[in-house]
Regions:
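Short coil/turn segments at secondary-structure boundaries
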Residues: 4-7, 134-138, 248-252
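Short secondary-structure capping/turn micro-motifs that flank functional sites
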Residues: 10-11, 56-57, 254
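A broad detector of the eukaryotic-type serine/threonine protein kinase catalytic domain
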Residues: 18-22, 170, 242
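Acidic, glycine-enriched catalytic cores built around paired aspartates
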Residues: 211-283
Length: 283
């Protein structure tokens, strides 16, 4: 972990990890969640990873900044200590190598050819990826409560927080359609499948959108929205063989059964909203 700050919502914290191998950082995020939850319990508190516990304030996302490297070697960083309080692997990071997403033209913003193809792959599969990155019923409160920078549109651009993907700096981009309840192993696997599909099949991502998506839509652009419910996202995933292949053998079946059951149990429940809206309603 290299940085943390108080985010917009009351009691909300943002934490950032050093760039590293996708599997290693998935391990770190999972370990942090467990430690955070345990420390909170010891202080009689709840470490809440729920995506949208309150409407009208920022939700909890988990944006993933990505680049694709060749080469590089693992290096142990003891941080100036003679001995370490955990396994060496915890303090090991990839160092060196070549970032294949770096610009390769005079346009210092535009990702290189490999990066553009990778973006194309993500754009193609964004609907199905949403089922992994926004994997709970509550996740979609984040997308419906507009005005808090949650991505609703399947597009990409530079520093454009209304898109599902933005180029956040030369040589890397930020996948935004992912929240605090996601599984980082499945998310990483899904994104790598998108990269592979985009690069192998030369998928063109189209032109980056410089306007906010709301402005673009008002100007007449035909925009594509992300799935706006868990049910819609699961349908998109069921149709996408590339993303399903990120969950091999029985894994996709288990994921589908578990998440479809969650969606159907929600549909079968009477909520407080139902009572507030219809209890004293005269048809």
């Amino acid at each position: 972990m290299i940085q943390g700050d108080h985010e917009d919502a009351p009691g909300q914290l943002e934490l950032n990890w050093t760039y590293d191998d996708v599997l290693r950082n998935a391990d770190r995020l999972s370990t942090y969640r467990q430690i955070c939850a345990q420390v909170a319990r010891e202080f009689n508190l709840i470490a809440c990873f729920m995506t949208k516990p309150f409407m009208g304030v920022s939700a909890s996302g988990c944006h993933t900044n990505m680049s694709l490297w060749s080469g590089g070697k693992d290096k142990l960083n003891k941080l100036g200590h003679k001995s370490l309080p955990a396994m060496d692997e915890v303090f090991t990071y990839v160092e060196g190598g070549k970032n294949t997403f770096m610009p390769d033209t005079k346009d210092i913003q535009l990702p290189g050819k490999v990066g553009l193809k990778a973006i194309g792959g993500v754009m193609k599969h964004l609907g199905a990826l949403t089922a992994i990155g926004s994997s709970t019923v509550n996740s979609y409160r984040r997308l419906w409560d507009q005005g808090f920078w949650a991505p609703v549109y399947a597009d990409w651009g530079y520093q454009n927080r209304t898109c599902g993907l933005r180029v956040s700096a030369p040589g890397r981009f930020e996948y935004r359609s992912v929240d605090s309840m996601h599984n980082p192993y499945l998310m990483g696997s899904g994104l790598l499948k998108c990269f592979d599909d985009g690069i192998s099949n030369n998928i063109d991502p189209g032109k980056p959108e410089s306007r906010s998506m709301y402005e673009a839509q008002a100007a007449g652009k035909e925009v594509k929205k992300l799935p706006l419910s868990l049910g819609q996202a699961l349908d998109r995933l069921a149709e996408d063989e590339v993303i399903k292949s990120a969950m091999p053998d029985e894994m996709y079946k288990v994921f589908h059964w578990y998440k479809n059951d969650e969606w159907e149990r929600f549909l079968g429940a009477t909520t407080q909203w139902d009572l507030d809206t219809y209890l004293d309603c005269l048809p």
